[in-house]
């Protein structure tokens, strides 16, 4: 009798162990901010499997949508180990969104903690993950710096921060340094007082207008040809290489063929570029897709068409397309 009890108990323990280890199908309701990538990480599965199980043709999901997922929740796997860090060094491919997810924070918390005015990051930049905010400089340093005529950009700086420090405005700083966007780089030397350099270009520049239609800082012909050369490259969430791109990774890759910009999100590009009424070749067009606000972007190539990394890979689409037309937010210039 004793032997039978032990055997039965063992069977129950083994059975419950096997049952606990098995991945089970479950229904989840999509919450605000969710993406297929988030869910695939959380439930230890893949985007392809989720799309296949739910007959999805794209990566777009909606708040309140019910999805069937085969997998196990991994939400508490790494939160405790990552939360002990107080700083983080930005790596290639990082974004505020990725870092905030990794350390259980919000993008706004990260930006406030590091005095960031936009979502742009630079490789090698050190971000604070805990501690007091670095929103403004002390009044004493503001007074002592007023006699300085140049300033070398440090990690975490922004035009807004520098303008506040030297008692000037972002517009004046940009004019003084001939800047066409709010993007600045570590070790860049900026004039904080003096004469404007914005009008130093020769007046007759019509011979080069065909290659610089929308921006004086980018060769538009090269931008478009570099982008078109990538048509057919597959879609990959967070991808920044020719093995696969997401929409902002594609833009980052093409821009870095000519200049040096940090990896950021579509929202980051939206907030750092200059608004224009209508796009010219080489400008950037923005859309709202799986969440409110800018969440997808592409490069305008003329004839009401744009090139972008969509769910089917890098492709050329029309702004009149029945999907894109109602989701169009506007155009920006680098």
UniProtKB/Swiss-Prot annotation:
Active site positions, chain numbering: 247 (nucleophile), 296 (proton acceptor), 308
Top-tier EC class: hydrolase
Keyword Acyltransferase: no
Signal peptide region: 1-25
BP-aspect Gene Ontology terms: cell wall organization; proteolysis
Compartments where found: Secreted, Cell wall
Gene3D superfamilies hit by this protein: endopeptidase domain like (from Nostoc punctiforme), LysM domain
Residues annotated as domain NlpC/P60: 217-334
Keyword Protease: yes
GO cellular component: extracellular region
Keywords linked to the UniProt accession: Cell wall, Cell wall biogenesis/degradation, Hydrolase, Protease, Repeat, Secreted, Signal, Thiol protease
GO MF terms held by the record: cysteine-type peptidase activity; lytic endotransglycosylase activity
Region (Disordered): 70-89, 131-153, 195-215
InterPro entries: LysM_dom, LysM_dom_sf, Murein_DD/LD_carboxypeptidase, NLP_P60_dom, Papain-like_cys_pep_sf
Effect of disrupting the coding gene: Cells lacking this gene are about twice as long as those of the wild-type strain.
Lineage top rank: taxon: Bacteria
Positions of the LysM domain: 26-69, 86-129, 149-192
Induction info: Expressed during the exponential growth phase, under the control of SigA (major) and SigH (minor). Is also positively regulated by the two-component system YycFG.
Low complexity: compositionally biased ranges: 72-87, 132-153
Function, as annotated: Cell wall hydrolase that cleaves gamma-D-glutamate-meso-diaminopimelate bonds in peptidoglycan. Seems to play a role in cell separation during vegetative growth.
UniProt comment concerning the protein's domains: The N-terminal domain contains LysM domains that are thought to be involved in peptidoglycan binding, while the C-terminal domain is endowed with the catalytic activity.
Family from the record: Belongs to the peptidase C40 family.
Protein name: Probable peptidoglycan endopeptidase LytE
Encoding gene per record: lytE
């Amino acid at each position: 009798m004793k032997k039978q009890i032990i055997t039965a108990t063992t069977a129950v323990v083994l059975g419950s162990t096997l049952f606990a280890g098995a991945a089970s199908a479950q229904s989840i309701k999509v919450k605000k901010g969710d993406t297929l990538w988030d869910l695939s990480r959380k439930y230890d599965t893949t985007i392809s499997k989720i799309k296949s199980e739910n007959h999805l043709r794209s990566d777009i999901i909606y708040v309140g949508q019910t999805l069937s997922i085969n997998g196990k929740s991994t939400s508490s796997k790494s939160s405790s180990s990552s939360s002990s860090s107080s700083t983080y060094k930005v790596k290639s491919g990082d974004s505020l969104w990725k870092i905030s997810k990794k350390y259980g924070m919000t993008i706004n918390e990260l930006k406030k903690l590091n005095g960031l005015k936009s979502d742009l990051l630079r490789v090698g930049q050190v971000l604070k993950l805990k501690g007091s905010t670095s929103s403004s400089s002390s009044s004493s340093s503001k007074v002592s710096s007023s006699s300085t005529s140049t300033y070398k950009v440090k990690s975490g700086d922004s035009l807004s921060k520098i303008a506040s420090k030297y008692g000037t405005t972002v517009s004046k700083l940009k004019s003084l340094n001939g800047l066409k966007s709010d993007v600045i780089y570590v070790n860049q030397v900026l004039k904080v007082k003096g004469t404007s350099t914005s009008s130093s270009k020769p007046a007759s520049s019509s011979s080069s207008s065909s290659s610089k239609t929308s921006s004086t800082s980018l060769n538009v012909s090269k931008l478009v040809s570099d982008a078109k050369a990538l048509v057919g490259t597959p879609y990959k969430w967070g991808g920044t290489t020719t093995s696969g791109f997401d929409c902002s990774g594609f833009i980052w890759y093409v821009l870095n063929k000519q200049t040096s910009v940090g990896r950021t999100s579509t929202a980051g590009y939206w907030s750092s570029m200059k608004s224009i009424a209508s796009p010219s070749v080489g400008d950037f067009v923005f859309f709202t897709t799986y969440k409110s606000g800018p969440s997808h972007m592409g490069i305008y190539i003329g004839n009401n068409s744009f090139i972008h990394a969509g769910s089917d890979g890098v492709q050329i689409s029309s702004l009149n397309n029945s999907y894109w037309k109602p989701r169009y937010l506007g155009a920006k210039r680098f």
